[in-house]
Amino acid sequence: MNPAHLLILAAVCVSPLGASSNRPMPLNLYQFKNMVQCTVPNRSWWHFADYGCYCGRGGSGTPVDDLDRCCQIHDNCYNEAEKISRCWPYFKTYSYECSQGTLTCKGGNNACAAAVCDCDRLAAICFAGAPYNDNNYNIDLKARCQ
């Protein structure tokens, strides 16, 4: 089976199983993953899924570094997008383009899709500019993210 299809299947299956204190796995994860791969082609997107205090599920405490701060800003951006009527960023898909490492959100997106696309685009650009520290991958959240 295509890895992309497995990713979508996992997102659909895992999201209802999460604890109530955790946000559901985003269904637009596939698009965000592709944006990250556009701006950071030399590192697997998976390295960003469990990084620091904010990259991945949840988010609390002080970001451990600039990359983690990118994820905190992305979380806050989604919180702002949720203020748009009937906008659920974790489930919203959008139109965008990747060309030679440059991301562009397309003009045909409605207000919610445009906001979510811009959140993801800015996060992917931020990831590209922030150093990656292997010591901040898969950290003990209880110990380091209070």
Swiss-Prot record:
It holds the Pfam family Phospholip_A2_1. Its cofactor is Ca(2+). One of its GO terms (cellular component) is extracellular region. One of its GO terms (molecular function) is phospholipid binding. Residues 22-27 form a propeptide. Expressed by the venom gland. Its EC number is 3.1.1.4. The keyword Membrane does not apply. It catalyses: a 1,2-diacyl-sn-glycero-3-phosphocholine + H2O = a 1-acyl-sn-glycero-3-phosphocholine + a fatty acid + H(+). The keyword Cell membrane does not apply. Residues 1-21 form the signal peptide. Binds 1 Ca(2+) ion. This is Neutral phospholipase A2 B.
